[in-house]
Regions:
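Hard-cation-handling environments
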Residues: 197-326, 330-355, 359-499, 503-516, ...
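Short acidic-glycine loop/turn motifs at beta-strand connectors
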Residues: 23-26, 148-151, 243, 419-421, ...
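C-terminal tails and terminal domains of large nucleic-acid-associated
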Residues: 519-552
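Conserved hydrophobic residues forming the short capping helix/wall of the S-adenosyl-L-methionine
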Residues: 104, 398, 534
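C-terminal edge-of-domain segments
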Residues: 456-458, 468, 545-555
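Structured loop/turn residues at beta-strand edges in well-structured enzyme cores
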Residues: 61, 128, 183-184, 286, ...
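Flexible glycine-/small-residue-rich
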Residues: 134, 149, 293-295, 467-469, ...
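His/Asp/Glu-rich metal-coordinating catalytic cores
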Residues: 1-67, 72-283, 302-313, 335-338
Length: 555
């Protein structure tokens, strides 16, 4: 009996944090290992959010391979966190491997088993046949992956658009292999849903050249562009425009410069000779130049804020500059993006954004998805990667094409689609899932004390109460000293501070008199009493931090 199980540890009903699991009998294949940025109410010092890897940790020995289809954070950003817990072979294309290896070195991850594979290839992992096919997306070397089962292939498309005019092989969509896979028999097709609400094809609306070229043509001074590092397609468009208008280019980001070196080393794309100026040779009084400011997530907006505030050592904006914001906000970065635009308008009135209604992100639109479904002709269709409305929109595309509703599988994170002997089982089981907050490289339990403490501090403040007692007699010899931050306006609430001190004294003195004094227990008792009193007087629940310092004194 053949048994295929399909489920997600992240990436369903959310933007980012993509991680999908295909179980072929006893073998586990993982596709993607991504993160997402925290929303404004999740921040609290959290840098990123990853899937909970508990299921994979418990089943580590069954994992035969982890496929990372391209170098975006939403599919690769959690890989270092994953490898701190699980040892597994990683399969990725050469450019993605270079990106990851730099990140792994920074985080001290070593001895990773990385298999560099071509975008269009077939090979075996154990007895399982794997086929890959190149896709057109915003970063080079992207691919989709097909895993052979006894009942047909399980295919994951990754991000893709259908574009027949791509000049560079590293961005080309492999229509031939997609057609070949369809003819071999596809059991289940997993496609992205982010662009499933857009009519038509994404191409040629994914290009910014037609929108940005008139700005280049009319610009008299410098041109400053912001762009995400991982949108290499857009970076190359800007470089080619600079070359067309005979302007030099300065790339102002170490990671983006490294990526362009990687592109040249791998033979994918080379910046035209003599066009690029290194940052150390850049002068702020240069006019005939395009400055490309790269970055990821919110870092790019903070970098531009620093430049606009004249705090940067290399670039200062001038009122003659033309600024093109080609890095639209992504979920979790909206506030930083808005602040950046305000800062830019204070320095120059020539600020242009990329119209997201005219320029599509490089995700499959409705007609792209229809073509993929038609060519693959899967038995089961599984929308993935997107918010719930996008998953439903994607499902409706297949429904409109005549697919039976019972053959369209819309899952939530953790829900398992189980296909036995080619037939979907009605009983729906689940695996444990959740969000893991990462701060400073360390994982924080989303429901744990660290985040609860941070939330308390951000809303209700903190009160610290300190006393010094004689180690031998337990007599109070110093304090109490009460410090309040973010709780009350001290001028109007002296009586509260005095009463908190009295509560602390009485708690210690009573415990000593009753011969039950214990430092830890006294602090816990004082914390509880002070919290009740402050709640009654102020309506707040601040963090209460009692401190009892015991010292030896000589008579």
């Amino acid at each position: 009996m053949s048994k295929v199980r399909i489920f997600a540890l992240g990436g369903l009903d959310e933007d980012g944090k993509n991680m999908f699991v295909i179980e072929n009998n006893d073998d586990i294949f993982v596709i993607e290992c991504g993160m997402r940025y925290p929303t404004s109410d999740e921040q609290l010092g959290v840098e990123m959010i990853t899937p909970d890897f508990q299921y994979l940790v418990e089943n580590e020995k069954r994992i035969k391979g982890v496929f990372v289809t391209h170098g975006h954070d939403d599919v690769m950003g959690a890989l270092t966190q994953f490898l701190k817990q699980v040892k597994a072979p990683i399969y990725m294309a050469p450019l993605t491997a270079r990106l990851f290896e730099r990140k792994a070195r920074k985080e001290g991850i070593r001895d990773v088993e990385i298999h560099r594979i071509r975008r269009n290839t077939n090979f075996k992992i154990g007895k399982t046949e794997i086929r890959t096919f190149g896709t057109t997306q915003s970063i080079a070397d992207g691919f989709g992956v097909a895993i052979r089962t006894e009942d047909g292939y399980v295919v994951y498309t990754s991000e893709f658009i259908v574009d027949y005019d791509v000049k560079m092989d590293a961005f080309r969509f492999d229509l031939t292999e997609v057609t070949e896979l369809g003819s071999r028999g596809v059991l289940a097709l997993l496609t992205e849903s982010v662009g499933s609400t857009r009519e038509g094809h994404s191409s040629p609306n994914h290009r910014i050249t037609s929108q940005v070229e008139p700005i280049f043509d009319n610009a008299e001074g410098r041109i400053v562009c912001t762009v995400y590092n991982q949108n290499l397609y857009r970076v190359i468009e800007l470089i080619e425009l600079a070359n067309k208008f005979k302007r030099k280019v300065m790339i102002y980001d170490d990671e983006l410069r490294s990526l362009m070196v990687d592109m040249a080393d791998l033979g994918y794309y080379r910046i035209p000779a003599g066009l690029e100026i290194a940052p150390q040779n850049f002068s702020n009084d240069m006019d005939n130049i395009v400055v490309i400011i790269g970055g990821t997530g919110s870092t790019i907006f903070r970098k531009v804020h620093k430049i606009a505030s004249r705090e940067d050592d290399v670039i200062q904006l001038r009122d003659t500059d033309t600024v093109i914001v080609a890095s639209p906000a992504v979920p979790g970065t909206e506030r930083d993006a808005s602040n950046m635009e305000d800062d830019l308008y204070k320095e120059t009135s020539r600020v242009y954004g990329v119209d997201t209604k005219r320029t599509f992100s490089m995700h499959a639109s409705i007609e792209d998805l229809k073509m993929m479904i038609y060519l693959m002709n899967p038995q089961y269709y599984v929308p993935v990667k997107g918010e719930y409305r996008q998953l439903i929109s994607n499902a409706n595309i297949a429904l409109d094409m005549g697919y039976p509703a019972n053959n369209i599988i819309v899952l939530e994170n953790g829900m398992i689609a189980c296909i036995e002997d080619g037939q979907l089982q009605r009983e729906m089981k689940t695996v444990p899932v959740g969000d893991v907050m990462v701060s400073g490289g360390d994982s924080l339990d989303a429901a744990g004390m660290v985040l609860k403490d941070r939330e308390t501090l951000s809303t209700d403040g903190a009160i610290v109460v300190g006393v010094v007692v004689n180690h031998g007699t337990k007599e109070i010899i110093g304090g109490p000293d009460v410090q309040s931050r973010g709780v009350i306006y001290l001028k109007d609430a002296d009586y509260i501070i005095r009463e908190i001190g009295v509560i602390m004294e009485n708690t210690i003195n009573t415990a000593v008199a009753e011969k039950r004094y214990d430092n830890l227990e006294c602090r816990a008792e004082a914390r509880e009493k002070i919290a009740r009193y402050v709640m009654k007087e102020t309506g707040k629940r601040p963090m209460i931090l009692p401190a009892i310092v015991e010292i030896n004194t000589k008579d």
